[in-house]
Amino acid sequence: MRKKISIIGAGFVGSTTAHWLAAKELGDIVLLDFVEGVPQGKALDLYEASPIEGFDVRVTGTNNYADTANSDVIVVTSGAPRKPGMSREDLIKVNADITRACISQAAPLSPNAVIIMVNNPLDAMTYLAAEVSGFPKERVIGQAGVLDAARYRTFIAMEAGVSVEDVQAMLMGGHGDEMVPLPRFSTISGIPVSEFIAPDRLAQIVERTRKGGGEIVNLLKTGSAYYAPAAATAQMVEAVLKDKKRVMPVAAYLTGQYGLNDIYFGVPVILGAGGVEKILELPLNEEEMALLNASAKAVRATLDTLKSL
């Protein structure tokens, strides 16, 4: 029996995620949105590409949550877009209501699903989704670190003049300007990145990574990134559905790891069929821990705002 993936939100990120997933033939796809005609039109358009691109999965669009029943993975991309000059925290009031509505309707219909959150502020919305769904925390995760690490790897490859395929990089922390790229855990085909890039340039790359989402928002003027976020989301879905045991940074629920409790936070995990199968604790130095704690403080402040609504 084919796997089933439901994507809630048929905007740029949602529909592009559907395209990546269809191309990978990971399962039948349901694209849901509250705007009548939009998910149906995008799903039909994508399905009509299947004879050309050669993927054999069904893609359907709907406004009815009943059509998402018995999903193996639920991806939530619904949310207000981020505008120039707007912080992720500005989005919290609007997107909290959207998240509650989506999860309260979708989760009961797919009690065994893994939920992947993609809306902002990411860490707080993932916490809210876990609370509303009542699912085990390991089956509710947030997509942030895979995207942020991809940006980091891209910038390293550009600077070093090497293939992006050979760059491995890790980062941690909240999804936002306080994320913590980790040059000490970044390599090019196993060679420390410091052998290729001078410390001052590496520091600039770290800062560009932190501002990566905002850079694209400022360039586009009327929207935000969607190709890379969708590709990152599809990679996480693939890790779950194929039980790949991928090591990747995701927003996971912490119960004492890194000295943090009752918070969704970007950390390296082993991702498989059960969602987060293990949280990996890296031996961070004093400077890295200070940055991590500062990031956690920012995430906690957003979470406190959420809880006060």
Curated annotation (Swiss-Prot):
Gene Ontology biological process terms in this record: carboxylic acid metabolic process; tricarboxylic acid cycle
EC number per UniProt: 1.1.1.37
Top-rank EC class of the record's enzyme: oxidoreductase
Role noted for this protein: Catalyzes the reversible oxidation of malate to oxaloacetate.
GO annotation, cellular component aspect: cytoplasm
Alphabetical keyword list: NAD, Oxidoreductase, Tricarboxylic acid cycle
Binding-site residues for substrate, renumbered to this chain: R82, R88, N120, R151
CDD domains in UniProt: LDH-like_MDH (cd01339)
Protein name, entry field: Malate dehydrogenase
Complex and partners: Homotetramer (active enzyme); homodimer and homotrimer at temperatures lower than 55 degrees Celsius (inactive forms).
Residues involved in NAD(+) binding: G9, A10, G11, F12, V13, G14, D33, N95, V118, N119, N120
Classification via InterPro entries: L-lactate/malate_DH, Lactate/malate_DH_C, Lactate/malate_DH_N, Lactate_DH/Glyco_Ohase_4_C, Malate_DH_type3, NAD(P)-bd_dom_sf
Organism: Chloroflexus aurantiacus (strain ATCC 29366 / DSM 635 / J-10-fl)
Location of the active site: H175
Recorded family membership: Belongs to the LDH/MDH superfamily. MDH type 3 family.
Lineage, opening ranks: Bacteria, Bacillati, Chloroflexota, Chloroflexia, Chloroflexales
Catalytic activity: (S)-malate + NAD(+) = oxaloacetate + NADH + H(+)
A Pfam family hit: Ldh_1_C
Transmembrane segments: none
Domain of life where this protein originates: Bacteria
